[in-house]
Amino acid sequence: MSAKIIAFPRPRQPPAAPAPTLWSVFEERAARNPRKRAVRDADGSMTYAELLNLSAQLGRAFLREAERQPRRRRIGMLGQNSAVHLATLLGCARAGLAMVPINWRLAEEEWCWQARDAAMCAVVEGFGHRMPEDFMAADEISAIGQSTIRMLPREPVTEAERGSPGDTVVIGYTSGTTGRPKGACLSQAAMLANARHSQALFEITADDRVLTMLPMFHLGGLNIQTVPALLAGAEIILHQKFDAEAFFDALTRHRPTLTLLVPAVMQALVEHRRWATADLSSLRAAGAGSSVVPLALIEAFQSRGVPIQQVYGSTETAPIAIAQSREEAWAAPGSIGRPVGDCEARLGPGGEIQLRGPSIMTGYLDDPAATAESLVEGWYRTGDIGSVDAEGRWWFTDRLKHMIISGGENISPAEVERVLAQAPGVLECAVIGRPDTKWGEVPLAVVVAGPGFDERKVLAFFEGRLARFKQPRAVAVVPALPRTALGKVNLPALRAMVAAPP
């Protein structure tokens, strides 16, 4: 008698939950407490439900623009900090499109170049900044201004979300050492990974009030604290731009628990007449970064009970990669901390800091050569030199790349040199950073003068061609530029030459 085999059906496995998107995380957060205030800005305040609806309406409007021009699926954002900036990001996430923040400090010519390079189909404009109308008309790019936004429908959007975790949701332009800025492509998954890192680092909860004064056209202002706090259900206090008086007023009026600073802002606050009597007790901590933070500034804040948590990263890392916990801010001021969350860090040749993890960019927009140079087997080459101490803390020591950092803004010398070379009376030129007590560094033009050279005319030549913060403050004339055996400008020798007394 043969045995009878009875086959039992396998129990059905529940379907795996879909991977979260930027929109799904925000939508879930808004559903928990729809009436809670999400954002304060110059126009008033907005609840989570109101921000959710505005974001969805903008997302639908963006899709219409993208369908009108299928080859252009990017949305520019030009304007000072506002709730609309956050709604633009969230609307793009819902629609499966990418937001491109535009630095309003740049010259109009630079705005237009970026709009073309990113293939924008529309630009959201606000708070006194507008793209040139003739350019927008010629390139068939739609302008979405405040009046258009006010006229958006108020009923809920019923269309399904189109975004997915792998979609590029932000293209952040970053100054490169070779001249033109490059667009770093960040996916929704990268933005969410950064949010997790930030929430753990700063211990962000729904009870927090985060003061954002730094511009959100930079990934630092947008994504070190602001978006992570929004996804945690906190309240965001947006200032259009940094103003020391407004900062001290906000301490009294809104009692923020967290904020983000750069050295130039810290210096301005410490030197302000209200610093000595200001009540900083509501601040649990402040993040700081963008360039080396002087120990004297760290001490000025920490002596008032506010730990300065240094953050290291770049646009390409969304941006947090290495950072200090609150405990380490007290224990090792000046260190940049340890790799955050799922991020890995190592020292490459020459002590270069190299990073790998879920928040790293997918690459540079339409630039495979630059991508291949910066991303090697998944490791992002930062171009910065660092070290690791016996306790495992990381320290920033120098830059491999020739970059000027002025008031928290990255300035590519090659970009400035391209304009300088066209100025009348300039035979040869180079641009280097000169130490400055207020800004950290400012650009200095070094030229070999020819017929018709006039320093005032050279400095005036930059007006309208480059943003004010990129323009050299002075010109140093040298008989010849020192060069290496390969013919490249010898930067250490050039710095020594212009620093030496005449």
Language model features with spans:
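Gly/Ser/Thr-rich phosphate-binding loop
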Residues: 256-261, 270-330, 344
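AMP-binding/adenylate-forming catalytic core of the ANL superfamily
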Residues: 60, 85, 347-349, 357, ...
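Conserved pre-ATP/AMP-binding loop-to-beta segment of ANL
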Residues: 19-22, 34, 143, 154-173, ...
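AMP-dependent adenylate-forming
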Residues: 24-47, 65
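ANL superfamily AMP-binding
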Residues: 35-36, 49-76, 106-108, 112, ...
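Structural core segment of the AMP-binding/adenylate-forming
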Residues: 64-65, 90, 94-154, 158-161, ...
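Conserved AMP-binding/adenylate-forming
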Residues: 44-45, 61-109, 410
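Conserved AMP-binding/adenylation subdomain of ANL enzymes
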Residues: 192-209, 217-258, 271-274
